[in-house]
């Protein structure tokens, strides 16, 4: 029985080689639209789909392959006598290969196009053919990914057929692709309408397999959103080997912290926790301030700066061991210096962080919430003493940092530098003591949540703190306010909590 292949692709890379390979084995090629013209122009013997259906393309190409004569040829089960009898009676030929890739909705949905223009890139005929062929994978070889062309050709060369195992894998890839494609379309259409829809559909594509996860015994891979360009799916590695699982997690937070600030800022980070954060006039200044805040923890850490890095900054950075250095750009002479460290990963971050929903898995489910991107409802002075202008700037700085520290979290600040960071403690007084121990000489203290007792204020006063900022909201707020008044400390309530678990 003569074999037939239906080829209809938007991305034509590799399709000529595949079509020629099939024709050389006497497989009849059927195609439509641009693919038909492309194959014809390249001297591939091809039959137009309208010759099969006796029905022309219509509605500006929206209806080409949506026809019973096409889908019956794909869906008929070859060892089902009734199916084959029906095909024979209606003079329908079987289709044995379906080679289809889709309109580039993933790419177009992120471009600056109108709503109507984006809708036109929603593919209908392609998914319909792919799903039909994938369902009948026992009898039909379905190719939705150009990376699989060679695998199929190799099996045919070696065995004169395509194995059941590969057919099944290719079918699975179709439904994997379709779930992502449909998710992207669904999220596009529901954007702004339904924040938390009945069914959660997410669309991510694998960028790479990772050597391992948090630990060597854990497998891992990195996936990129198909729906928007965030900071972590558009960076460029300028030096060093590929990023690890831990590198990517740490880089994400370090870059978010640095981008919290309009002024030049640096975040040094270790194990997903900031260990030194500073703002200043230039990249060298902020790096040195962040380094001085905790010269021990920064070793082997991640450093992100929200400005171009120059040679002077690079020369300071290579004095110690760092895993990753990230910035929006680098001077050429700075790159030369950084590249003297062969294993230092130098990352050019092209995008600022995008405020999207945050997801975390639990056993049997996923929790979804909005990003913590609200700093304060107000800055309400609740004490007799008011903060100075510099103290208020440090307060706001502290709140920008503390929301990235695991709760309970306290940050001590002095002149635009986080001099002490205490986090991940099960009670607030321990976090306060940790931050004050590391941040001796700090003037302002920021807390991610309210003080349940006055003990944190008393501890702050013993260590020279002059101003405190916190959300407020405790039933014992008055005790903390009274303690501040006793110690001559100003305190500001923001009304916004920043728990991080």
From Swiss-Prot:
Protein name: Bifunctional purine biosynthesis protein PurH
UniProt pathway annotation: Purine metabolism; IMP biosynthesis via de novo pathway; 5-formamido-1-(5-phospho-D-ribosyl)imidazole-4-carboxamide from 5-amino-1-(5-phospho-D-ribosyl)imidazole-4-carboxamide (10-formyl THF route): step 1/1; Purine metabolism; IMP biosynthesis via de novo pathway; IMP from 5-formamido-1-(5-phospho-D-ribosyl)imidazole-4-carboxamide: step 1/1
Comment block on domains: The IMP cyclohydrolase activity resides in the N-terminal region.
Pfam families: AICARFT_IMPCHas (PF01808), MGS (PF02142)
Domain MGS-like: 1-144
Record keyword Transferase present: yes
Stretches assigned to coiled coil: none
Transcription regulation as UniProt keyword: no
Gene Ontology cellular component terms for the protein in this record: cytosol
UniProt keywords, alphabetically: Hydrolase, Multifunctional enzyme, Purine biosynthesis, Transferase
Family (UniProt): Belongs to the PurH family.
Record's catalysed reaction(s): (6R)-10-formyltetrahydrofolate + 5-amino-1-(5-phospho-beta-D-ribosyl)imidazole-4-carboxamide = 5-formamido-1-(5-phospho-D-ribosyl)imidazole-4-carboxamide + (6S)-5,6,7,8-tetrahydrofolate; IMP + H2O = 5-formamido-1-(5-phospho-D-ribosyl)imidazole-4-carboxamide
Listed InterPro entries: AICAR_Tfase_dup_dom_sf, Cytidine_deaminase-like, MGS-like_dom, MGS-like_dom_sf, PurH-like
Record GO biological process: 'de novo' IMP biosynthetic process
Organism: Clostridium perfringens (strain ATCC 13124 / DSM 756 / JCM 1290 / NCIMB 6125 / NCTC 8237 / Type A)
Gene Ontology MF annotations: IMP cyclohydrolase activity; phosphoribosylaminoimidazolecarboxamide formyltransferase activity
């Amino acid at each position: 029985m003569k074999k037939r292949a239906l080829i209809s692709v938007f991305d034509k890379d590799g399709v000529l080689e595949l079509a020629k390979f099939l024709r050389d084995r006497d497989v009849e090629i059927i195609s439509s639209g641009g693919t038909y013209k492309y194959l014809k122009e390249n001297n591939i013997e091809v039959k137009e789909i309208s010759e099969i259906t006796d029905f022309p393309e219509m509605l500006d190409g929206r209806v080409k392959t949506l026809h019973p004569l096409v889908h019956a040829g794909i869906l008929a089960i070859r060892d089902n006598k009734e199916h084959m009898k029906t095909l024979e009676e209606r003079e329908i030929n079987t289709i044995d290969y379906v080679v289809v890739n889709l309109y580039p909705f993933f790419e177009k949905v992120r471009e600056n196009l109108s709503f109507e223009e984006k809708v036109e890139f929603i593919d209908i005929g392609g998914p319909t053919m792919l799903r039909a062929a994938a369902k009948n994978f026992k009898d039909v070889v379905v190719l939705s990914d150009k990376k699989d062309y060679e695998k199929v050709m190799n099996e045919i060369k070696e065995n004169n057929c395509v194995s059941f195992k590969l057919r099944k894998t290719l079918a699975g890839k179709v439904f994997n692709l379709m779930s992502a494609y449909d998710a992207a379309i669904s999220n596009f259409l529901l954007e702004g309408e339904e924040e938390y829809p009945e069914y959660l559909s997410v669309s991510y594509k694998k960028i790479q397999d990772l050597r391992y996860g948090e630990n060597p015994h854990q497998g891992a891979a990195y996936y990129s959103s198909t729906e928007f360009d965030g900071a972590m799916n558009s960076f460029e590695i300028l030096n060093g080997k590929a990023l690890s699982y831990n590198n990517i997690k740490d880089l994400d937070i370090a870059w978010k912290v640095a981008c919290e600030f309009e002024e030049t800022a640096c975040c040094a980070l270790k194990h997903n926790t900031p260990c030194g954060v500073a703002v200043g006039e230039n990249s060298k200044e902020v790096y040195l301030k962040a380094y001085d805040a905790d010269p021990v923890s920064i070793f082997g850490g991640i450093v992100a700066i929200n400005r171009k890095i120059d040679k002077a900054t690079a020369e300071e950075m290579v004095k110690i061991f760092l895993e990753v250095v990230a910035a929006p750009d680098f001077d050429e002479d700075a790159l030369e210096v950084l590249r003297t460290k062969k294993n230092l990963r130098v990352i050019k971050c092209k995008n600022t962080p995008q405020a999207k929903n945050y997801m975390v898995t639990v056993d049997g489910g996923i929790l979804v919430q909005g990003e913590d991107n609200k700093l304060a409802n107000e800055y309400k002075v609740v004490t007799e003493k008011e903060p100075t202008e510099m103290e208020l700037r440090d307060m706001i700085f502290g709140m920008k940092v503390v929301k990235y520290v695991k709760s309970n979290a306290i940050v001590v600040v002095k002149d635009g530098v986080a001099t002490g960071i205490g986090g991940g403690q099960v009670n607030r007084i321990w976090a306060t003591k940790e931050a004050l121990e590391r941040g001796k000489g700090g003037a302002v203290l920021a807390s991610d949540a309210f003080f349940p007792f006055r003990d944190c204020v008393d501890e702050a006063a013993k260590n020279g703190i002059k101003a405190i900022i916190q959300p407020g909201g405790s039933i014992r707020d008055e005790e903390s306010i009274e303690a501040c008044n006793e110690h001559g400390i100003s305190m500001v309530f923001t009304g916004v909590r920043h728990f991080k678990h």
